[in-house]
Amino acid sequence: MKRIDGRAYDELRPIKIIPGYQSFAEGSALIKLGKTHVLCSVTAEERVPSFLKGSGAGWITAEYAMLPRATVTRTRRDSTLGRVGGRNQEIQRLIGRSLRAVADLDALGERTLMVDCDVLQADGGTRTAAISGAYIALYMAMETLQNMGVISSIPLKSAVAATSIGIVNGSMMMDLCYDEDAQAGVDFNVVMTS
C-alpha cells in the first residue's frame, strides 16, 4: 500500500517551527506538521494551584482547543457548549503531563506556566504537534524568565517531542495524516524525552 502523500511508512511529514510567533507571550511557537498547524504560547503567572501554595514548587498546565474551521467541517467551540469537551480535556492533560515530566518544578519556583495550544488547521497529529510545539514555547518562556532574572537557570531536565504510530490496512505507519488516521485499525501516540 502506498501512503496518501507518498511518504515512506517511517517518515514524518515536513516539520516547520516558527519560534517567537507571538509578540506578547513569554514564549511561543507555530508548529507546522504537514497540513497540521498548531500555535503554542506560554504565559507566566505568579501564582500556583492551592495544593502547591507554600511548597516553593511551580506548575505547568495546558489548554488545547481547535478553531472551528481548523477542520473540513466546522466544529463547535467548547465555550458554546459551556464545558471543555472530553477529547480536548484528555489532550490538554496529555500536553501538561508531557511537559511536567521534563521540568524541574522546584527550580521553577512558585509560579504557573500556562501553555495554550490552538489548532489553526487539523490534518491529523494535532496532539503530537501540540506537545512538540508546546515544548519549544515552554523553553522560550523559561529563557525569557531567566533573562528577566526571575529564575536563575532554565529548569528543564530534557527535551520532549511526540508522534503517532498506526496500522492502516495492515501496514504500520508513523505520523498519520487525517485520512490515514480515519482508516487506522490501531493508532497511538508516542511521547519521548531526549
Where are these regions (language model features)?
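Polyanion-binding surfaces on beta-sheet-dominated domains and ring/shell assemblies
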Residues: M1-S194
